[in-house]
A protein has these predicted regions:
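Acidic/histidine-enriched, beta-strand-rich ligand/metal-binding domains
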Residues: 1-69
Length: 69
């Protein structure tokens, strides 16, 4: 999945697979997580003033995830 860089203290890059409904988040520490989220949530993350805060408040502990690296 292609990811693109974002301006964030904790998040390095974000990608989304529309067909699978999977958000991929790469953190500055090198870890990568995938979250099963609807496209609207992905768009909300992109539009958020703080990507980290949006992830914490609207995605983490709400949607299924897996650590892939």
């Amino acid at each position: 999945m292609d990811r693109f860089r974002v301006e964030s203290r904790t998040i390095a890059a974000i990608g989304y697979d529309l067909a699978a409904g999977v958000l991929e988040v790469e953190f500055h520490d090198g870890s990568v997580y995938q979250y099963d989220v609807p496209h609207a949530i992905y768009e909300g993350l992109l539009d958020a003033k703080s990507h980290s805060k949006y992830l914490r408040d609207h995605i983490r502990d709400v949607y299924p995830f897996r650590k892939i690296r």
